[in-house]
From Swiss-Prot:
It comes from the Bacteria. The lineage of its organism: Bacteria, Pseudomonadati, Pseudomonadota, Alphaproteobacteria, Rickettsiales. Gene3D superfamilies: 1.10.287.3980. This is Large ribosomal subunit protein bL34. Belongs to the bacterial ribosomal protein bL34 family. The keyword Ribosomal protein applies. One of its GO terms (cellular component) is ribonucleoprotein complex. One of its GO terms (molecular function) is structural constituent of ribosome. The keyword Ribonucleoprotein applies. GO terms for biological process: translation. Keywords: Ribonucleoprotein, Ribosomal protein.
Length: 44
């Protein structure tokens, strides 16, 4: 059985990156919450 986590920086950026967060309303809500919490890193 292969492992479930097969790291790829491209897929990581496309799925969880800042620009992908910005295109959806819920994604923007996530960024807003993370800013409010004071997260140093907003997205992947």
């Amino acid at each position: 059985m292969k492992r479930t986590f097969q790291p790829s920086n491209l897929v990581r950026k496309r799925r969880h990156g800042f620009r992908s967060r910005m295109i959806t309303v819920t994604g923007r809500a996530i960024l807003k919450k993370r800013r409010a919490k004071g997260r140093h890193k907003l997205s992947a």
